[in-house]
Amino acid sequence: MQNAKRKMQNCQGFSLLELMIAMFILIILLSVALPTYQYTVQHARETVLKENIRQIENAIDQYAADKGKLPQSIDELVEAKYLREKPVDPITEKTEWDQVMGDDAFSSEGGQGLVDVKSLAEGEDSDGKPYKDY
């Protein structure tokens, strides 16, 4: 019986103060790590946005070189297999883009065609540049 009491006295748990100190340290670590994580995620989205716009612009150029005219939309680039699918804007999380139409210098008939794409996202990136200026 005394042996059991002695074992119970040696098996003490954490005190409330020790638990509070551990929680305080965790809160400090999270307050440092969370903004870094959020910045990294935002920077990754901006990088993907730039890459998606670059891929669309390259597809426009390749389409114009092959067909002798500009495409009329991003959907036409997908249908003609210059893009696998309509890219997603990682900021808005939609496949909608501002499709900039302009004079078709490639076509002998003239007319208008897709010359550029812009993001429809509001706001600015982490460097202060508006998403619409990408």
Go through each PLM region and give its residues.
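A generic structural signal for short
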Residues: 14, 48-49, 61-63
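N-terminal single-pass transmembrane signal-anchor helix
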Residues: 11-37
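N-terminal leader/signal peptides at the extreme start of proteins
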Residues: 1-12
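Aliphatic-rich helix starts adjacent to a transmembrane/signal segment
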Residues: 27, 34-53
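Low-complexity, acidic interaction segments enriched in glycine
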Residues: 54-134
